[in-house]
């Protein structure tokens, strides 16, 4: 599902909201999650999962095209850990509850 599809689904499920308002809400949620991660904060959505950042140490990598060894700098990457309820829904194929 793309962000556009998510917005369309949410707008269809909530006809009392304008599509542009739903788009603004979704964009605000993504922006706030991104800002929190940029600050190094943890974002926990109960029943869904938690977003955190993890540090990847510097290492020596290999260019797959040339085989040349290259230095890969240390970096911070976003990480998502699914919550118990989300894992159970995915494993059981159960639709989301309203």
UniProtKB/Swiss-Prot annotation:
InterPro entries, per the entry: Hist_DNA-bd, Histone-like_DNA-bd_CS, IHF-like_DNA-bd_dom_sf, IHF_beta
Entries under Pfam families matching the protein: Bac_DNA_binding
GO CC terms: chromosome; cytosol
Keywords of this entry: DNA recombination, DNA-binding, Transcription, Transcription regulation, Translation regulation
Stored CDD domains: IHF_B
Keyword Transcription regulation on entry: yes
A single MF term (Gene Ontology): DNA binding
GO biological process: DNA recombination; regulation of DNA-templated transcription; regulation of translation
HAMAP family assigned: IHF_beta
Homology family: Belongs to the bacterial histone-like protein family.
Assembly and oligomerization: Heterodimer of an alpha and a beta chain.
Protein's job: This protein is one of the two subunits of integration host factor, a specific DNA-binding protein that functions in genetic recombination as well as in transcriptional and translational control.
Protein's UniProt name: Integration host factor subunit beta
Organism of provenance: Gluconacetobacter diazotrophicus (strain ATCC 49037 / DSM 5601 / CCUG 37298 / CIP 103539 / LMG 7603 / PAl5)
Gene name per UniProt: ihfB
């Amino acid at each position: 599902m793309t962000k556009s599809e998510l917005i369309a689904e949410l707008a269809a499920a909530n006809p009392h909201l304008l599509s542009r308002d739903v788009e603004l809400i979704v964009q605000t949620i993504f922006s706030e999650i991104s800002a929190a991660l940029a600050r190094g904060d943890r974002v926990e959505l109960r029943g869904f999962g938690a977003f955190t950042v993890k540090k990847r140490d510097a290492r020596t990598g290999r260019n797959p095209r040339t085989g040349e060894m290259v230095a890969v700098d240390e970096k911070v990457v976003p990480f998502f850990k699914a919550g118990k309820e989300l894992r159970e829904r995915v494993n059981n194929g159960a639709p989301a509850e309203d």
